[in-house]
Amino acid sequence: IILDFFSGSATTAHSVFLANIEQNLNRRFILVQIPELIDASKGSEKSKKVAKNAINLLDSMKVPHTICEIGKERIRRAGAKIKEENPEKAQKLDKGFRVLKLDSSNMKEVFYSPKETTQQDLFALVDNVKDDRTSKDLLFQVMLELGATLDSKIEESEVDGKTIYNIGDGYLVACFDQEVSDDVVKAIAKMQPTYAVLRDTGMADDATATNFEQIFK
């Protein structure tokens, strides 16, 4: 695994793709970059022009003016170009990548003293997940907590209108939707996961929650 801190425009990723093709290897990479804004007002005239062109590209993509966005687009284009120029060698080239961002906890602050806690607060804390967090946010948190690597294969399926995530061929199976039915619980059980995770408040009713506990006891 090649690790590149302050990876800029992702030249390392581009180079790894090329080396993998030339040497028939499967090296992987981790790139780390602060989402620094591109400034077209500083530096030489040449660097200003390069920065302006980058900003114009990002505007056309309707994404923020950061070096990270340039890096992501370079990885996409580099992978596509290499596959186009080396159709036979590139058949097994994995040009996919996953973008993760550092953030605060998905959980609400729940450390209150008895004097600070009202009856209304207790009801509000029944579901302690922050309102702006998505199922994917929760999924990656659980993956880290349960020891699944962040590059693990993620498969999505749908049962009874609910999304089920299968991580690492059954190592972890999770569903973070609300109103999860008995059919969803049974579908998860059939996958025989090492770990099965649902939201505390996600069960459709008490009977479903009891069934889940009995199945995975």
Per-region residue spans from a language model:
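Accessory, often C-terminal, charged low-complexity segments
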Residues: I1, A19-K217
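Conserved class I S-adenosyl-L-methionine
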Residues: I1-G8
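Glycine-rich SAM-binding Motif I of class I
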Residues: A10-H14
